[in-house]
From Swiss-Prot:
The lineage of its organism: Bacteria, Pseudomonadati, Pseudomonadota, Gammaproteobacteria, Alteromonadales. Keywords: ATP synthesis, Cell inner membrane, Cell membrane, CF(0), Hydrogen ion transport, Ion transport, Membrane, Transmembrane, Transmembrane helix, Transport. The keyword Transport applies. It is a multi-pass membrane protein. Signal peptide: none annotated. Pfam families: ATP-synt_A (PF00119). It comes from Shewanella sp. (strain MR-4). Its main location: membrane. Belongs to the ATPase A chain family. Key component of the proton channel; it plays a direct role in the translocation of protons across the membrane. CDD domains: ATP-synt_Fo_a_6. One of its GO terms (cellular component) is proton-transporting ATP synthase complex. This is ATP synthase subunit a.
Length: 264
């Protein structure tokens, strides 16, 4: 339902749920809802982990502390297995990426109409609540990782070592420098693009399926009953999807940064 209260066609309903609340035009468009939920969930993550860390005890831990410790241990083991350099930033970065991306993905588990309906009561016409269904958010995360890849590649190998890596691999001959540069540049640029589009594509598709299922509730009793079954089944399966996508984003970040620390 739109903020005006007018009924929407199926096409209009889908378009409404896939439209961001935004200001500005063209390149300078700001997606207010994506920024609000991504920053808000990031602050929530920091607050929860900081609170648990301050109250952590060596005695019998509470349920929340046990859960947080399990996540931290899981991420720490993943870093130890995949990162072969020495860098105190990698484990905290991996933890932040995994939990933050998971929390943004988890917003997809909320019924598609709840928060947009509440927003419409306040006169807000559009509201997308899943930040990772916005390609701008996923590319922002991926570009942040890409900057770290370039930074540590130059820091560990030096400018000359980084240039040699781009120009003398995989074919170690001066005549092949243009070919090497082309191949390595494409490989380097493909890293953030694949990170961003993989996360965006999976979450966008998942959100679209939830929206299509929600359309079934406005038809007849038979389709509405089928919609309940489909939504429950997709909800259960989607828990795996959102967790797996957060894990993949984290692991690829660890692997890419590990490669940046390898001095050939």
């Amino acid at each position: 339902m739109a903020a005006t209260g007018e009924a929407l066609t199926p096409q209009g309903y889908i378009q409404h749920h896939l439209t961001n609340l935004h200001v500005g035009e063209g390149f300078w468009t700001w997606h207010i809802d994506s920024l609000f939920f991504s920053v808000g969930l990031g602050v929530l993550f920091l607050w929860i982990f900081r609170s648990v860390g301050k109250k952590a005890t060596s005695g019998v831990p509470g349920k929340l502390q046990c859960f947080i410790e399990m996540i931290v241990e899981f991420v720490d083991n993943s870093v130890k297995e995949s990162f072969h350099g020495r860098n105190a930033l990698i484990a905290p970065l991996a933890l932040t990426i995994f939990v933050w991306v998971f929390m943004m993905n988890f917003m997809d588990m909320l019924p598609v109409d709840w928060l947009p309906w509440l927003a419409s009561l306040a006169g807000v016409p559009y509201l997308k609540v899943v930040p990772t269904t916005d390609v701008n958010i996923t590319f922002s995360l991926a570009i942040g990782v890409f900057v770290l890849i370039i930074y540590y590649s130059i820091k560990v190998k030096g400018v000359s070592g980084f240039v040699k890596e781009l120009t003398l691999q995989p074919f170690n001959h001066k005549a092949m420098i243009p070919v090497n540069l082309l191949l390595e540049t494409v490989t380097l640029i493909a890293k953030p693009i694949s990170l961003a589009l993989r996360l965006f594509g999976n979450l966008y598709a998942g959100e679209l399926i939830f929206i299509l299922i929600a359309l079934m509730y406005g038809t007849n009793l038979l389709l509405s009953s089928l919609g309940v079954t489909l939504q429950l089944g997709w909800l259960i399966f989607h828990i795996l999807v959102i967790t797996l996508q957060a894990f993949i984003f984290m692991m690829l970040t660890i692997v890419y940064l590990s490669m940046a620390h390898e001095d050939h």
